[in-house]
């Protein structure tokens, strides 16, 4: 069945003036009724009143009594005319207008009592909105530029670790030197020799040459005076101090070498364990690359 289209009759009270349609619409706005039946009944009543009344039509006037915008003349002077900067966010917040319709729909507060923080989005919100895709099915440009391969995990922290001082590393070594050897390797005093911290310079570790004894010179008894015996005692004390210092240094080097041997064996065992663990990791990585491709 074909639906009969019925045309609405024009309002006979509306007479377009000769000076423009836009101005006439602004001055004389039309109000369309909600129900077409009421419009037909009102048009019939108005037609009867117009037939009974005078033939001169009356132009309806606008309800606004103030001056119209086009009747005003703004003073313009090229020297004094200046443009003022206006912040859009501030203007919207002062007038209680939300910057986006989503905030206006979901805001529980009235427009005049909205906090300023809700009307001005932060930089983080703008960055998140820029990175988020417009539609759920369309990926963002950043995802297209940096594709994530299957199985690839992004590290939570990319910062490189701070450098470690090798001297601060403590290797667990089960080494306990003999207290008697420590006493022979320590200088008389409160501080004891520590083979874990004591380091020797290259000069101290150089091989010492063999000291040859000087050939004895025979001196008759009548020439052995007090000056001779004083010089003899002085030389003997210097030789004794030299022997004690050399023996002390040899004992320290021996205890230090014993500790380094223990530490070397512990480090070798640790390196062997690390190599075994590295071999397992390489095997797992090779199996993963064979199944999913290279990383």
Curated annotation (Swiss-Prot):
**What are the recorded GO MF terms, alphabetically?**
DNA-binding transcription activator activity, RNA polymerase II-specific; DNA-binding transcription factor activity, RNA polymerase II-specific; RNA polymerase II cis-regulatory region sequence-specific DNA binding; sequence-specific DNA binding; sequence-specific double-stranded DNA binding
Q: Which segments show compositional bias classed as Basic and acidic residues?
A: 34-52
Q: Show the PROSITE patterns listed in the entry.
A: BZIP
Assembly: Binds DNA specifically as homodimer or heterodimer with other PAR factors.
What is this protein's tissue specificity according to the annotation? Isoform HLF43 is abundant in brain, liver and kidney. Isoform HLF36 is expressed only in the liver. Both isoforms accumulate in the liver with different circadian amplitudes. Isoform HLF36 reaches peak expression levels between 8 and 12 p.m. Isoform HLF43 displays a more pronounced fluctuation through the day.
On whether Glycosyltransferase is a keyword of this UniProt record, the answer is no
Q: State the family named in the UniProt similarity comment for this chain.
A: Belongs to the bZIP family. PAR subfamily.
Q: Name one GO cellular component term.
A: RNA polymerase II transcription regulator complex
Q: Which organism is it from?
A: Rattus norvegicus (Rat)
Residues of the region (Basic motif) are: 227-247
**Where is each bZIP domain found?**
225-288
Q: Which residues form a coiled coil?
A: none
Question: Does the record's keyword annotation contain Protein biosynthesis?
Answer: no
Please identify the protein, giving its name as recorded: Hepatic leukemia factor
Q: Which InterPro entries match?
A: bZIP, bZIP_sf, PAR_bZIP
Localization (cell) = Nucleus
Give the main localization category: nucleus
Q: Give me the ranges of the annotated region Leucine-zipper.
A: 248-255
Where is the stretch described as Disordered? 34-69, 93-160
Q: Which Gene Ontology BP terms does the record give?
A: positive regulation of transcription by RNA polymerase II; regulation of transcription by RNA polymerase II; rhythmic process; skeletal muscle cell differentiation
Keywords assigned by UniProt? Answer: Biological rhythms, DNA-binding, Nucleus, Transcription, Transcription regulation
Q: What induces it?
A: Accumulates according to a robust circadian rhythm.
């Amino acid at each position: 069945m074909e639906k009969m289209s019925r045309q609405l009759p024009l309002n006979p009270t509306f007479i377009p003036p000769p000076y423009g349609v836009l101005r006439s619409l602004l001055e004389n706005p039309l109000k369309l009724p909600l129900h077409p039946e009421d419009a037909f009944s009102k048009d019939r009543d108005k037609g009867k009143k117009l037939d009974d009344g005078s033939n001169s039509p009356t132009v309806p006037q606008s309800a606004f009594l103030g001056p119209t915008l086009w009747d005003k003349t703004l003073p313009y002077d090229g020297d004094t005319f200046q443009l003022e900067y206006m912040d859009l966010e501030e203007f919207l917040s002062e007038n209680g207008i939300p910057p986006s319709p989503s905030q206006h729909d979901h805001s529980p507060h009235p427009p005049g009592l909205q906090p300023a923080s809700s009307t001005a989005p932060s930089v983080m919100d703008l960055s998140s909105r820029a990175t988020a895709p417009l539609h759920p099915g369309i990926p963002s440009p950043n995802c297209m530029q940096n594709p994530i391969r299957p199985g690839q995990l992004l590290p939570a922290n990319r910062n490189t670790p701070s450098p470690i001082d090798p001297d601060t590393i403590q290797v667990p070594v089960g080494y306990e030197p003999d207290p008697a050897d420590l006493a022979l390797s320590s200088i008389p005093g409160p501080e004891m020799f520590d083979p874990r911290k004591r380091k020797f310079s290259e000069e101290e570790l150089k091989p010492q040459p063999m000291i040859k004894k000087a050939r004895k010179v025979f001196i008759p008894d009548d020439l052995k005076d007090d000056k001779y015996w004083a010089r003899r005692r002085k030389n003997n004390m210097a030789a004794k101090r030299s022997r004690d210092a050399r023996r002390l240094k040899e004992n320290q080097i021996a205890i230090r070498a014993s500790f380094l041997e223990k530490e070397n064996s512990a480090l070798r065992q640790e390196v062997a364990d690390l190599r075994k663990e590295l071999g397992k990791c390489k095997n797992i990585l090779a199996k993963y690359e064979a199944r999913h491709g290279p990383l």
